[in-house]
Amino acid sequence: TSPKRYRKETSYVYSCGWPPVFLGDLNYYLEDYDLTTVAGEIDTNRVGVHILSAEYDCSGTAELGQAAHQAIAGSTFQEMKNVGHFPMSENPKAFLEYLLPTLDRIAAA
């Protein structure tokens, strides 16, 4: 699990957002936008797509990440264990364990 101090800080920072803005964010990514309609058009020869989905992300689940990966030919996918929606701030050390190898693969390509 993520260190408590990072979880608390992340929760505090996120809760400081103006509530109507947050509601707009939720509406956009839960209702308005559907990647599945255009995912197959993404050309990974022109732009790399590397999907890192968090085990404890309730809005962007690992299942949704896997589905996006399957819809985007040439993409990569990895489920990040023991982190949530904000892995970079809630557990930076754990996040780097997933991010750095991904960046290494990009640099080697």
Model-predicted regions and their roles:
Residues 1, 33, 103-107:
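A general structural signal marking secondary-structure boundaries and capping sites
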Residues 2-70, 76-79:
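Conserved serine/cysteine hydrolase catalytic core
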Residues 72-109:
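Catalytic active-site module of serine/aspartate enzymes centered on a nucleophile-bearing elbow/loop
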